[in-house]
């Protein structure tokens, strides 16, 4: 079985190397990234989506399908960990330890968590105008839960974020992202064409709000998946 797995991985590696040979060279003026399309995206960020952060417009609007796929990949990784680690009762390995009580670390942690969470919300909601977005904000919120797990202990930190919410929250994030695209489809546009969202706003502002909606979905997906993976590793799949 091990030999077969190595054979499959080796074959996959050869396929990837062969595909990589067809990629354009760095700095190639004839490469797609160096042609007029990139300039159009940069110039159109404010005009099309009323968003000064070009990176956010690129990720969540112009190539929204790709980012939806990335969000689904993150959630799929969480599902894979769940399937691998959440074994039947007999096969479980007890990996969960009890942290030693420490008043100083407890107080500092409780003081830091709301500050980090507030900054994470800023990162999500201000991603149109400064570096940030759903991936970064979701990861920051997840770190507060992970910090609580490590300092306060698994049982005590359940009040902050129950383990049972991890996978459903990740699924909800993917559903929000895909749902925004489906709503646009229902109202006569292409999937993820936010200018067709039924909000009664100018087209550029519709795309601006659409970007925010999908970024919130990404934040939910990333947060739920990261916490779910960490909890599975921490508890041995309990």
Describe each region flagged by the PLM.
Residues 74-83, 143-149, 213-228:
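Hydrophobic cores of alpha-helical transmembrane segments in multi-pass inner/ER membrane proteins
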Residues 4-35, 124:
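N-terminal signal-anchor transmembrane alpha helix
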Residues 42, 46-59, 193-210:
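Short, membrane-exposed interhelical loops at transmembrane-helix boundaries
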Residues 1-12, 162-174:
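Alpha-helical transmembrane segments and their helix-start/interface "positive-inside/aromatic belt" motifs
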Residues 68-69, 128-141:
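Short, non-helical or kinked segments that cap or interrupt transmembrane helices
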Residues 21-44, 186-195:
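Interfacial/capping segments of alpha-helical transmembrane domains
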Residues 95-112:
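Membrane-water interface at loop-to-transmembrane-helix junctions
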Residues 53-82, 208, 212:
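Individual transmembrane alpha-helix segments
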């Amino acid at each position: 079985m091990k030999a077969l797995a190595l054979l499959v991985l080796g074959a996959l590696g050869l396929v990837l190397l062969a595909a990589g040979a067809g990629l354009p060279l760095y700095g190639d003026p004839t490469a797609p990234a160096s042609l007029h399309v990139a300039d159009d995206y940069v110039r159109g960020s404010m005009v099309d989506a009323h968003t000064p952060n070009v990176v956010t417009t690129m990720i969540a609007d112009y190539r929204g399908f790709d980012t939806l796929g990335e969000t689904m990949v993150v959630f799929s990784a969480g599902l894979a960990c769940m399937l691998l680690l959440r074994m039947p009762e007999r096969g479980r390995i007890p990996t969960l330890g009890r942290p030693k009580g420490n008043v100083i670390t407890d107080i500092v942690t409780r003081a830091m968590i709301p500050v980090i969470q507030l900054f994470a919300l800023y990162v999500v909601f201000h991603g149109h105008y400064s570096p940030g977005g759903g991936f970064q904000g979701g990861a920051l919120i997840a770190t507060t839960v992970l910090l609580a797990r490590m300092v306060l202990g698994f049982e005590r930190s359940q009040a902050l974020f129950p383990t049972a919410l991890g996978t459903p929250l990740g699924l909800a994030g993917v559903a929000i992202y895909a749902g925004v695209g489906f709503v646009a489809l229902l109202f006569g546009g292409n999937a993820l064409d936010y200018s067709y969202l039924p909000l009664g706003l100018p087209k550029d502002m519709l795309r601006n709000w659409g970007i925010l909606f999908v970024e919130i979905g990404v934040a939910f997906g990333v947060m739920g998946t990261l916490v779910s993976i960490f909890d599975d590793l921490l508890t041995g799949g309990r």
